[in-house]
């Protein structure tokens, strides 16, 4: 029998009390919890859970992601593998599941409901998962829920394909995650009544309050891409009596340079610093995801799996030790989860481009331009006089209007989609990426066509990755796994990403906090307001392509 004991101040979240205790662990489970008379400087509590994340956004395979986040007390994630599913289909999902099983960390994957985010009528992905594919996935024990339903128009209009996907989960008593930013109350009601139970896309507290009143659960998101904590954290105190079971924390997208510094523990510390009830905050971080998603993660009760964390600081939640299934996976600054060098998979069929491929023309006097916002994945739409791009529709550096392009990476010789974007701030150069939500085609923005072409061909030569360049220098961060993930450690990936980002800001001149991250969401046509994909400029509000 594998038996050991720890002594620490036991944080009993359920009964809202803290007391010194001796906790016995046997065969990976909590065997006993006994009060003791002692003065102790350590605290023990259940591990943290990220209630919605795309592991691929960290540029790390699951095992290497786990190696990093156990340092911050995270023991489990509710993971949506729709990034790799858009590239490699079910093979990509299986890649994530199989890699995750090589570690003690608890990954709970969902079946991606919208691959692509919209139908192939609207964008080109590497694969399409139809309702029959989803039904087969939902039969698997490794699939715990239906991941975020982004096609809100399909839900509201009762499109048979998306309704079948939702019902496939519900009939198996598996939950359905939502994604519904900016809907009117009437449309939100229709969306929620389909059986969708969560949303992590609330941008305003009013939207969140209304969804809570409908019985939905709200995930307070504070990740690398979108940051909504400041807008939504008052819900924690508002909901302490009525809706405390209905809140969770998530990152959604987490870049390695951010999670080197912390994960859900940072949100917990921040919420407590804002004066919210200590135990309510921990309930949101540790307990609510377990109960909602019905996942086998321990809550530090007798008989539970021994998933817990130890800290000396219940203000910052700097972690000293992390245990999963009774095994020590992080110990005083050292992660004990092994790094795994996976064999890459990919899906890339795109040949070299020429400068002339990036030409643009229109006869329209006024043309729509994407207006990006730092640290947000939404955009605004603005109209400009086409004379600002005279004489040959190039980027206008003085007005900060840059050409943006999407290249279909899956079907060679497809027409390049071209538009214009404001607020990027690049003065002399280009950046590009195959991390382009959600279909992950090649997305580029630059100060002229020559730079765009050079960045495109650098990415094509490497079959994916992140790129930034000017006349003097080209930097490429290789992402050999589906053009989304690296085989390297988090520390090395973070170092590369920081170097790229610094180059984008300090050399190319971008004023955005994270230019590559912002660029990656300019193609996500299920988040308002104006986006671009491989088939053209898309107005999310009117749900149609925009003619130039």
UniProtKB/Swiss-Prot annotation:
UniProtKB keywords: Hydrolase, Manganese, Plasmid
CDD domains in UniProt: AdeC
Swiss-Prot/TrEMBL cofactor(s): Mn(2+)
InterPro entries hit by this protein: Adenine_deam, Adenine_deam_C, Amidohydro-rel, Metal-dep_hydrolase_composite, Metal_Hydrolase
Main enzyme class: hydrolase
Family matches, as Pfam families: Adenine_deam_C (PF13382), Amidohydro_1 (PF01979)
Name of the protein in question: Adenine deaminase
């Amino acid at each position: 029998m594998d038996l050991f004991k720890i002594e620490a101040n036991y944080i009993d979240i359920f009964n809202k009390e803290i007391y010194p205790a001796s906790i016995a662990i046997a065969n990976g489970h909590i065997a006993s919890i006994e009060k003791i008379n002692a003065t102790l400087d350590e605290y023990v509590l259940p591990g943290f859970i990220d209630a919605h994340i795309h592991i691929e956004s960290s540029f790390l395979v699951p095992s290497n992601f786990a190696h990093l986040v156990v340092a911050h007390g995270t023991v489990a994630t509710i993971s949506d593998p729709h990034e790799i599913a858009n590239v490699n289909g079910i093979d990509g999902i299986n890649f994530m599941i199989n890699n995750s099983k090589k570690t003690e960390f608890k990954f709970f994957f969902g079946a991606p409901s919208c691959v692509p985010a919209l139908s192939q009528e609207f964008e080109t992905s590497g694969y399409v998962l139809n309702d029959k594919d989803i039904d087969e996935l939902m039969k698997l024990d490794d699939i715990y829920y239906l991941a975020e339903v982004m096609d809100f128009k399909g839900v509201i209009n009762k499109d048979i394909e998306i309704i079948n996907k939702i019902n496939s989960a519900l009939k198996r008593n598996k939950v359905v995650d939502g994604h519904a930013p900016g809907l009117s109350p009437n449309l939100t009601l229709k969306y929620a009544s389909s059986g969708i139970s969560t949303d992590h896309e609330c941008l305003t507290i009013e939207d969140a309050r209304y969804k809570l009143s409908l019985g939905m659960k709200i995930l307070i998101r504070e990740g690398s891409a979108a940051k909504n904590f400041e807008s939504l954290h008052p819900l924690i105190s508002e909901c302490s009596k009525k809706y405390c079971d209905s809140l969770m924390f998530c990152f959604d997208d987490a870049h390695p340079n951010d999670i080197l510094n912390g994960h859900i523990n940072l949100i917990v510390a921040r919420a407590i610093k804002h004066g919210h009830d200590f135990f309510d905050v921990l309930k949101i971080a540790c307990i609510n995801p377990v109960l909602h998603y019905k996942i086998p993660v321990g809550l530090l009760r007798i008989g539970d799996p021994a998933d817990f964390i130890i800290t000396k600081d219940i203000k910052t939640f700097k972690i000293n030790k992390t245990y999963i299934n009774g095994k020590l996976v992080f110990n005083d600054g050292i992660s004990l989860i092994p790094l795994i060098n996976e064999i890459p998979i990919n899906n890339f069929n795109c040949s070299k481009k020429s400068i002339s491929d990036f030409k643009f023309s229109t006869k329209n006097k006024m043309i729509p331009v994407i207006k990006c916002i730092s640290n947000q994945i939404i955009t605004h739409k603005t109209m400009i006089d086409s004379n600002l791009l005279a004489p040959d529709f190039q980027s206008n550096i003085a007005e900060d209007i840059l050409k943006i392009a999407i290249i279909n990476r899956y079907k060679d010789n497809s027409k390049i989609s071209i538009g214009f974007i404001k607020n990027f701030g690049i003065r002399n150069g280009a950046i590009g990426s195959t991390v382009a939500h959600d279909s992950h085609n090649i997305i580029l923005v630059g100060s002229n066509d020559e730079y765009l072409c050079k960045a495109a061909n650098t990415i094509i030569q490497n079959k994916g990755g992140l790129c930034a360049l000017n006349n003097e220098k080209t930097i490429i961060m290789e992402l050999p796994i589906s053009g989304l993930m690296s085989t390297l450690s988090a520390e090395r990936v973070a170092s590369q990403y920081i170097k790229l980002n610094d180059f984008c800001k300090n050399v190319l001149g971008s004023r955005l906090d994270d230019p590559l991250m912002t660029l990656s969401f300019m193609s996500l046509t299920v988040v308002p307001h104006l986006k671009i994909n491989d088939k053209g400029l898309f107005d999310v509000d009117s749900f149609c392509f925009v003619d130039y």
